[in-house]
C-alpha cells in the first residue's frame, strides 16, 4: 500500500467513528484506544499539531503565521524527515521559536491493520526500534530525550497495544480530536476523497459552533506539507483561521502545556 492510499484508508476509518466515543468530563483528557484525543475543555486553549514525513512546503508559512501572532504549536516529524538535509532549517526554526518537537515514527510504518484494528503488524522490538531511531534523530537537533513526552503515531492510526508499548518507552501517545476535516489537508485534487481548503476551514468553524465546549482542548491536526498532488494548500487559510479563532477567545499552546 502506498503512503497516500494508506492515508486514505486511515481517514475513512477515523471518520466512520461516532463522536460520542470521545466525550469525557471537562477537566480530564479524552482517550480512545489508550491514546489521548482531546485535552481538558475548561479553558479556551487549542493545541495545533503538525505532522511531517515526505513534504514540507507549508512549514515556512505555518511558522510565519504563528510567529506573527505569538502562537505556539507542536510538530511531530519522522526520522526520515529529520534526516533530510533540505528540511534541517525548518527543524531548527521549530526549536528556536519555542514550538514542541516530537516523534512521528522513524519510517512512517503502518503499526496496525486498517480493518482489524486490534491486529498489530509488527513486533514490540521492531516498534521500539522504529520509535527510538526517531528519538535519536530528534536528539541530533539538540532536543534531549528527557524533554520528549508526547508523540503522534504514523498515519494517526494505532491500537491499545501500541499505546501500551509507547508507555513502556516513557511516551504518551496522542492523536487528533475528531469532528473536523483538518487532517484531510494532505488529499490531492485527483483523489476521490479530496477535501478542499474551504471545506476544511468551514468544518473547523462549524465544529466550534456545534460542540458544547467549542474547540476547547482540541488537538487540531494539519500537515507541514501535502506534496505536488495538492495545489489547494491549506496553509493559504491558516493565518485567517488563527485570527478568527483568536477573535473567539482561543489561545494556541503546545501539547505539553495543554496536557500537563
Where are these regions (language model features)?
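Active-site beta->alpha N-cap acidic-glycine motif
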Residues: 27-118, 132-149, 233, 244
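Bacterial Sec-dependent signal peptides at the C-terminal "C-region" and cleavage site
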Residues: 10, 17-30
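Bacterial N-terminal signal peptides that target proteins for export
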Residues: 1-11
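Generic detector of low-complexity/intrinsically disordered segments
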Residues: 17-22, 68, 244-247
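Catalytic domains of cell-wall/extracellular-matrix polysaccharide-remodeling enzymes
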Residues: 61, 85-86, 108-221, 225-246, ...
Amino acid at each position: 500500500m502506498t503512503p497516500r492510499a494508506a492515508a486514505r484508508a486511515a481517514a475513512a476509518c477515523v471518520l466512520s467513528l461516532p463522536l460520542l466515543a470521545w466525550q469525557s468530563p471537562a477537566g480530564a483528557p479524552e482517550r480512545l484506544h489508550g491514546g489521548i484525543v482531546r485535552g481538558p475543555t475548561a479553558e479556551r486553549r487549542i493545541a495545533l499539531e503538525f505532522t511531517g514525513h515526505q513534504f514540507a512546503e507549508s512549514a515556512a508559512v505555518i511558522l510565519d503565521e504563528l510567529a506573527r501572532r505569538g502562537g505556539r504549536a507542536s510538530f511531530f516529524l519522522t526520522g526520515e524527515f529529520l534526516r533530510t538535509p533540505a528540511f534541517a532549517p525548518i527543524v531548527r526554526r521549530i526549536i528556536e521559536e519555542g514550538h514542541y518537537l516530537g516523534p512521528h515514527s522513524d519510517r512512517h510504518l503502518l503499526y496496525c491493520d486498517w480493518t482489524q484494528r486490534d491486529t498489530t503488524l509488527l513486533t514490540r522490538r521492531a516498534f521500539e526500534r522504529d520509535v527510538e531511531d526517531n528519538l535519536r534523530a530528534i536528539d541530533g537537533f539538540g532536543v534531549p530525550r528527557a524533554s520528549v513526552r508526547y508523540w503522534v503515531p504514523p498515519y494517526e492510526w494505532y491500537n491499545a497495544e501500541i499505546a501500551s508499548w509507547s508507555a513502556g518507552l516513557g511516551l504518551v501517545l496522542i492523536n487528533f480530536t475528531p469532528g473536523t476535516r483538518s487532517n484531510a489537508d494532505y488529499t490531492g485534487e485527483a483523489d476521490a476523497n479530496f477535501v478542499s481548503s474551504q471545506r476544511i476551514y468551514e468544518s473547523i468553524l462549524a465544529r466550534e459552533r456545534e460542540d458544547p465546549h467549542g474547540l476547547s482542548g482540541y488537538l487540531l491536526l494539519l500537515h507541514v506539507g501535502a506534496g505536488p498532488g495538492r495545489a489547494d494548500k491549506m496553509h493559504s487559510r491558516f493565518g485567517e483561521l488563527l485570527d478568527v479563532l483568536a477573535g473567539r477567545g482561543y489561545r494556541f499552546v503546545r501539547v505539553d502545556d495543554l496536557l500537563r
